[in-house]
Regions:
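Extreme N-terminal leader/targeting segments of oxidoreductases
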Residues: 1-17, 35
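N-terminal Rossmann-like FAD-binding beta1-loop-alpha1 element of flavoenzymes
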Residues: 17-42
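Glycine-rich, N-terminal phosphate-binding loop of Rossmann-like dinucleotide-binding domains
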Residues: 22, 66, 202, 233-234
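Generic hydrophobic/aromatic pocket-lining and core-packing "Φ" positions
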Residues: 27-30, 116, 271
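Glycine-rich FAD pyrophosphate-binding loop
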Residues: 35-56
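N-terminal glycine-rich dinucleotide-binding loop that anchors FAD/FMN and/or NAD(P) in oxidoreductases
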Residues: 56-86
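Conserved redox-cofactor binding core of oxidoreductases
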Residues: 104-222, 226, 239-243
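Glycine-rich loop(s) and the adjacent beta-strand/alpha-helix scaffold that form part
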Residues: 205-292
Length: 292
């Protein structure tokens, strides 16, 4: 298969970890792995100027529980209240909801303990007034947050990304992390029941401005291997066909016109690719779309 734009041999070079997706989730995963001493490769179909994905366009609101900002405003919050709010919203009423519930419990634990300090130590700061997004009713008995928990980061989305982009560049300078932009993953390689690498298409170089659709012209192919492959790409907000396909039945027919609040590359294509490799995808009708 020759050589790709990374300047590495596509057939023989291996990495400890390949991360598919250079958005916020991918950057967090990649920097944590690199700081743990792993050799990491981050692949993304978009050009380098789109590093950070759709998080760049976000308002930068973060979920903290019983934070200094809340206490300063007189907001009385607690781990127990936050978990009750979360469970009241999510429901977790399907047989496949065991692991989603476990994840929710772990995330509330994180938000009520080390999350803020971890981000603060990386340089992140927050607006002193806590917002009340996803507002619930009276008391923690139904849908939404019963108290304000929406902590807006100074610098909004770019401010959330900055520490992780910085850490990624530092890891890159140490030789622990490598980026492969314009590398579109089309297949996860499965051998003996395990994912061992990725195959895909090299997309033509494109200097398009961040947020605008980039070219899908194919200029080559690649195959890369790793001990672990992490797919950190799952948003479907710009793929209205996919949104309509999995539109919740309880809401009736999907709307004929949809307002898109994310760039065109938020296409959800890695969902089917991951499922084809053996992943179990659940709750595809439970969507959350923010118009950033």
């Amino acid at each position: 298969m020759g050589r790709n734009t990374l300047g590495i041999n596509c057939m023989s070079d291996t990495f400890d970890v390949i991360v598919v997706g250079a958005g916020l989730a991918g950057l967090v995963c990649a920097t944590e792995a690199a700081d743990a001493g792993k050799r990491v490769l981050v692949l993304d179909q978009e050009p380098e100027q789109s590093l950070g994905g759709q998080a760049f366009w976000s308002f930068g609101g973060l979920f903290f529980v019983d934070s200094p900002e809340q206490r300063r405003m007189g907001v009385k919050d607690s781990h127990a209240l936050a978990l009750t709010d979360w469970l009241g919203t999510a429901g977790f009423d399907r047989p496949e909801d065991h692991w989603p519930r476990r994840w929710a419990e772990a995330y509330v634990d994180f938000a009520a303990s080390e999350k803020r300090r971890w981000l603060y130590d990386m340089g992140m700061r927050w607006f002193p007034v806590v917002g009340w997004a996803e507002r619930g009713g009276h008391g923690s008995i139904g849908h939404g947050n019963s108290v304000p928990r929406f902590h807006v980061t100074w610098g909004t989305g770019p401010g959330v990304l900055e520490p992780f982009v910085r850490r990624a560049r530092e890891a890159q300078a140490r030789g622990k992390l490598q980026f492969g932009f314009r590398h579109r993953v089309d297949e996860l390689i499965v051998e003996r029941g395990a994912v061992v690498g990725v195959r895909g298409s090299l997309l033509a170089e494109d200097k398009v401005e961040r947020g605008k659709p980039s070219s899908r012209e194919i200029s080559g192919a690649f195959e890369l291997r790793a001990q672990a492959v992490v797919v950190a790409s799952g948003g479907i907000g710009a793929n209205h066909e996919l949104v309509r396909k999995y539109w919740p039945e309880r809401l009736g027919a999907p709307p004929a016109h949809m307002l898109c609040g994310v760039p065109a590359h938020v296409d959800g294509r890695m969902l089917d690719i991951t499922e084809a490799a053996g992943a179990q995808l659940i709750n595809r009708d439970r969507m959350w779309h923010y118009v950033e």
